[in-house]
Amino acid sequence: MVMFKKIKSFEVVFNDPEKVYGSGEKVAGRVTVEVCEVTRVKAVRILACGVAKVLWMQGSQQCKQTLDYLRYEDTLLLEDQPTGENEMVIMRPGNKYEYKFGFELPQGPLGTSFKGKYGCVDYWVKAFLDRPSQPTQEAKKNFEVMDLVDVNTPDLMAPVSAKKEKKVSCMFIPDGRVSVSARIDRKGFCEGDDISIHADFENTCSRIVVPKAAIVARHTYLANGQTKVLTQKLSSVRGNHIISGTCASWRGKSLRVQKIRPSILGCNILRVEYSLLIYVSVPGSKKVILDLPLVIGSRSGLSSRTSSMASRTSSEMSWIDLNIPDTPEAPPCYMDVIPEDHRLESPTTPLLDDVDDSQDSPIFMYAPEFQFMPPPTYTEVDPCVLNNNNNNVQ
């Protein structure tokens, strides 16, 4: 019966564990070994890999595809390693043995580290401890890689614009149109940047519409001639209601790019893309949607001074908005306090509806008849005080 000798510790340690590597950079570290008893070691090997993988089930068919970015193998030596083919290292308890390693990542595009529902891009170093008459011991450690996406290129610094118009109908009867045109100053952004939106909206239908904007991520997986697409809404902003026969404009409405991974565009089996959707919610009808493509990069294209100025302006505006008026305001419109159960919006676009926290206005401009009491007449005279005065006179 063969008794397996236990290893106290066997691990891969990087010199800079928090570093995010790029193409052409050197990955360096060491493999450390500690034993519980005297152990003969034949070899310590490493295997470094970088691979993109996608996998999902399409009915009874398994859709699977892989793409290699990195493969590096090496046999490591101690600094005082015995020489010779049959020479082995005798490891003793109480000592810590370190095997150093280093390799360079390939030049050119690399897939950014990513983990999605149906695929991932992983980079790791796996170490193997070979011992005679013993099973091979393994240790694995992942490291992060980010492909450079420079948003300062002319293509990504160019403005992006689009416009769209939709005819609205009610019971097959034409009910006017809703149109939207929008523009952003550039296509490339990085996390923390503010997207300045310029848009014009026109509503000639009889309904109250609401303009909104959202940043959306699309994950596309490709394998065996099949495609799987997942879409996720990341952040959003909305404007004021637009009543019938009126227009509205956004002049620099801001939407911040949250902490997200850069775009992955150069991989043949996995893509991560982003879009700015500017859309108008039309109750009882499909939304009018503009899709402006975005590229999220790894190098900021907006100066810190611009961000600082925008932040300061936003702060000053917030103080203006919080000023308390000298005269008391009138009570809110009765329509504003109607329970949400009486409001209606057709869930024609689930992605854009799911994250909208509040419902929009009633469908038509003219008020429908509700089955509850009408509001009391507004007056600034307290009726209780008036009744007390009348009683005193009597």
Swiss-Prot record:
Cross-link (Glycyl lysine isopeptide (Lys-Gly) (interchain with G-Cter in ubiquitin)): K212
UniProt name for this protein: Thioredoxin-interacting protein
Subcellular location per the Swiss-Prot or TrEMBL entry: Cytoplasm
Keywords, alphabetical: Cell cycle, Cytoplasm, Disulfide bond, Isopeptide bond, Phosphoprotein, Transcription, Transcription regulation, Tumor suppressor, Ubl conjugation
Gene Ontology BP term (one): response to estradiol
InterPro entries reported for this sequence: Arrestin-like_C (IPR014752), Arrestin-like_N (IPR011021), Arrestin_C-like (IPR011022), Arrestin_domain-protein (IPR050357), Ig_E-set (IPR014756)
A GO molecular-function descriptor: ubiquitin protein ligase binding
Record PTM: Ubiquitinated; undergoes heterotypic 'Lys-48'-/'Lys-63'-branched polyubiquitination catalyzed by ITCH and UBR5 resulting in proteasomal degradation. Deubiquitinated by USP5, leading to TXNIP stabilization.
GO cellular component: cytoplasm
Organism: Rattus norvegicus
Main location: cytoplasm
Complexes and interactors: Homodimer; disulfide-linked. Interacts with TXN/thioredoxin through its redox-active site. Interacts with transcriptional repressors ZBTB16, ZBTB32 and HDAC1. Interacts with DDIT4.
Family: Belongs to the arrestin family.
Annotated SUPFAM superfamilies: E set domains
